[in-house]
């Protein structure tokens, strides 16, 4: 699957490693690290809440990790994990869902990458308006990744209009009858596919 993504325009590969909620596993990340044909960066997508998970991510071949602000309620803990990730050579993607979390992310030292998740964690409703509303809060020098609810080229165009730099797509690719075609559709515009 990773090779299909790489051959059709993806700029990175997101690997679900959370077992409890998403039926992923760390072994998939390890295997991809050693078997993929491309050199695309690998993002470990998990609920990272402990320093040991960062060391584990690095040892397993991850280039980047997801830090979900909603799962890390203590600002100091979020800052410590963010700093350690950078120290270990991992790129932290700090995921936000609302204005409060966005403000928390902006307080981090050396913040370069923020993911705006369009899924409401309380209702699980998805709306691209989340990205449209939060994007203006974030300085242009910070790379913005829109996450969730991205299914069509029209969605990508809509996000490009608010200066989103990249998109993280999962469900639309996994459920597509032709994954290669869907990757090309979503990556053929002014926004990179992650």
Predicted segments, located by residue:
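C-terminal helical cap(s) of enzyme catalytic domains, especially alpha/beta-barrels
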Residues: 128, 133-137, 160, 173-194
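Catalytic-face loop-and-helix region of soluble metabolic enzyme cores
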Residues: 112-169
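Glycine/Thr-rich beta-alpha phosphate-binding loop at enzyme active sites
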Residues: 1-23, 104-135
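Glycine-rich phosphate-binding active-site loops on the catalytic face of alpha/beta enzymes
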Residues: 11, 15, 59-73, 115-123, ...
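Glycine-rich active-site/cofactor-binding loop and its immediate structural neighborhood
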Residues: 1-45, 50-51, 56
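Conserved anion-binding
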Residues: 37-125, 140
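Catalytic cores of alpha/beta
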Residues: 49-61, 99-109, 146, 150-169, ...
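Charged helix-capping and loop-helix junction motifs
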Residues: 26-30, 76-80, 126-133
